[in-house]
């Protein structure tokens, strides 16, 4: 659809952070101790350490973004205010698919790193013998008051921060998805306003037809139910459905063999269900909606299985869930196309916010244009004064020459012509 605005929302909050690295003061080098001063072609200049626990992640994001020529050009031309305000992040819509894919991968890796911290806390309580200090060494710089040792207080502080970040990450994704859907509808309606009555009816008819095509899909099993897991067992794992065994299933899908099903491993179980509804080759299927559906499925299963709310599923929790009635006889699962994602009042409120923002931008643009015109007038006035001054000086010099007086220099000193 021409009004579709594809956004990678979770990346929007990252680009403003580049300000820290961009504004950093370069390190002075004692050139007396540098033996080879010849320039090295294509030498790589490492950005300074920001001191943030996501420093490495930040550097990797910047490196990936700078591989995109369009974004690199925008970054070079952007001023500090554009970076701070987040306006530069809107350019993410225009980066290549390859760059977006790499950014997605970096984001997943960073979220996984935070999850490792939570697993370390659980392992510490169970005393499994894991080297926690080695695992958490990368996070020790967070505690500026105690940089030498890692105490229990440091671990608790990081656990709370990681948990809060992950929870906020999910909430933000839901909020941004809702805004995305409202923006799509807003753009669609605005586009219809530009059409004739006949063309508008054609577009409305196409829109309804695409909705019907999207809603026409096989039944989606309830996430985490026996039917859903057995389908994965049979179709993905290639095993006999009559031999389905929850314990074996758990071990098969504990990909990293750490004794837990983390959020990523859980989300992988829903791929077949999502493929029933979404196909990237179909214009009527929105892949951003698919990821929202995946998130909803994961949150739902976690709410039913993850008893201690540590965002990890143990084998014990998993087996206990398979003994519940809901595992065998679950309620039907409602996909996004069966739900009202926003009300008409919410859309109107969102559109009013957009209108306010557009008016503010328009006013700002008018102010900047006025400032530009004022500066141009001042420049023209100064140029005119400068021209008048030069003309007056030339006139005075000519008059002095006519009177036989030696011309003077800029400071009033006399200038004598050499005799020939």
UniProtKB/Swiss-Prot annotation:
The modification Phosphoserine is found at residue 332. Ca(2+) 1 binds at residues 254, 256, 258, 265. It comes from Mus musculus. It holds the Pfam family EF-hand_7. The gene is Nucb2. Residues 1-24 form the signal peptide. Residues 193-225, 365-420 are annotated as: Disordered. GO terms for molecular function: calcium ion binding; DNA binding; G-protein alpha-subunit binding; guanyl-nucleotide exchange factor activity. Calcium-binding protein which may have a role in calcium homeostasis. Acts as a non-receptor guanine nucleotide exchange factor which binds to and activates guanine nucleotide-binding protein (G-protein) alpha subunit GNAI3. It is a peripheral membrane protein. Transmembrane segments: none annotated. It is found in: Cytoplasm; Perikaryon; Endoplasmic reticulum; Golgi apparatus. Its main location: cytoplasm. Ca(2+) 2 binds at residues 306, 308, 310, 317. This is Nucleobindin-2. The lineage of its organism: Eukaryota, Metazoa, Chordata, Craniata, Vertebrata. Found in liver, heart, thymus, muscle, intestine, kidney, lung, spleen and throughout the brain, in cerebral cortex, hippocampus, hypothalamus and medulla oblongata. Nucb2 and necdin levels were higher in postmitotic neurons. The keyword Iron-sulfur does not apply. A motif (GBA) lies at residues 304-334. Residues 365-389 have a biased composition (Basic and acidic residues). Residues 213-420 are annotated as: Binds to necdin. Residues 241-276, 293-328 form the EF-hand domain. Keywords: Calcium, Cleavage on pair of basic residues, Cytoplasm, DNA-binding, Endoplasmic reticulum, Golgi apparatus, Guanine-nucleotide releasing factor, Membrane, Metal-binding, Nucleus, Phosphoprotein, Repeat, Secreted, Signal. GO terms for cellular component: cytoplasm; endoplasmic reticulum; endoplasmic reticulum-Golgi intermediate compartment; extracellular region; Golgi apparatus; nuclear outer membrane; nucleus; perikaryon. The GBA (G-alpha binding and activating) motif mediates binding to the alpha subunits of guanine nucleotide-binding proteins (G proteins). The keyword Zinc-finger does not apply. Interacts (via GBA motif) with guanine nucleotide-binding protein G(i) alpha subunit GNAI3. Preferentially interacts with inactive rather than active GNAI3. Interaction with GNAI3 is inhibited when NUCB2 binds calcium, probably due to a conformational change which renders the GBA motif inaccessible. Binds to the postmitotic growth suppressor NDN; coexpression abolishes NUCB2 secretion. Interacts with MC4R. Belongs to the nucleobindin family.
